[in-house]
Amino acid sequence: MNKIRKGDEVVVIAGRDKGKRGKVNRVQKDGKLVVSGVNMVKRHTKPNPMLGTAGGIVEKEAPIQASNVAIFNSATDKPDRIGFKILEDGKKVRIFKSTNELVDN
């Protein structure tokens, strides 16, 4: 069970985009995340008349290491750590370490 999942709001805690917030768009198998508006890179693309795409410089999000982000806790308005808890019915859920509240509602 991954600590950070697609759709979570995260804060970058290390690197050139430190302090930025964004939503996780994709979680890769190698432990990297694609976060909206974070780690923007420029790609030079060729025009492709078959697909109808124009060439030029395209700015897009690049993957960032999961260790460089922390989940955002809206209750405390701060980045937080994630723990796991097993409920009475045997279901394993994610909780915020600081408040012990469930991440998934």
UniProtKB/Swiss-Prot annotation:
Q: Which GO terms describe its cellular component?
A: ribonucleoprotein complex; ribosome
User: What PROSITE patterns does the entry give?
Assistant: RIBOSOMAL_L24
Q: Please state which protein family the record places this protein in.
A: Belongs to the universal ribosomal protein uL24 family.
Cite the GO molecular-function annotations of the record.
rRNA binding; structural constituent of ribosome
An annotated GO BP: translation
This chain's function reads: One of two assembly initiator proteins, it binds directly to the 5'-end of the 23S rRNA, where it nucleates assembly of the 50S subunit. One of the proteins that surrounds the polypeptide exit tunnel on the outside of the subunit.
Keywords annotated in UniProt: Ribonucleoprotein, Ribosomal protein, RNA-binding, rRNA-binding
This protein's name: Large ribosomal subunit protein uL24
